[in-house]
Amino acid sequence: MASRKRTSGAPKATGLRQGLATYGDAGFSLFLRKAFIKAAGYTDDALDRPIVGITNTFSDFNPCHGNVPDLIESVKRGILLQGALPLVFPTISIHESFSHPTSMYLRNLMAMDTEEMVRAQPMDSVVMIGGCDKTLPAQIMAAASADHPAIVLPVGPMLVG
């Protein structure tokens, strides 16, 4: 992937102001972005904060990740306490016994999906919540390539049936 480094001396845009869609008018692009996100109930104050994305691999097909909803809520609380805005988004979820023909090629697809979602969304950093032997490597690969500060949070042990 090509690096998206700044070439000018201008300060780096943060929060919702970064990575605006190219409509030819940055003000209009920001207006559209805010109009849509405000429909989710966010205030102007919240939208002026740094954004921390929280990506996760929760799926009913993936018993390894059964505690992900609780982890998401804990991470969101911590981010809010630090004055940032947490925004949650999903990525592909892989479980070995539910993947046909094999989960290995899905690992690479998940890495690309996660990297591109992190790059495409206006976030200042990201917390990646996942587990198992394919999703964690995919998230680490994405974190290494996405050029955003990232924390990978393993889900911990899976409950047995």
Residue ranges and their predicted role:
Residues 26-30, 34, 48, 65-73, ...:
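Electropositive phosphate-/nucleotide-binding environments in soluble metabolic enzymes
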Residues 2-49:
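N-terminal amphipathic/basic leader segments beginning at the initiator methionine
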Residues 32-40, 80-128:
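Glycine-rich oxoanion-binding loops at beta->alpha junctions
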Residues 12-21, 52-59, 89-101, 118:
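Gly-rich Lys/Arg/Thr-decorated short loops/hinges at beta-loop-alpha junctions or inter-strand turns
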Residues 44-48, 52-53, 59-88:
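Glycine-rich phosphate/diphosphate-binding loop of Rossmann-like nucleotide-binding domains
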Residues 40, 56-58, 71, 89-92, ...:
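Fold-independent oxyanion-binding glycine-rich loops
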Residues 104-161:
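Active-site cavity-forming subdomains of large catalytic enzyme subunits
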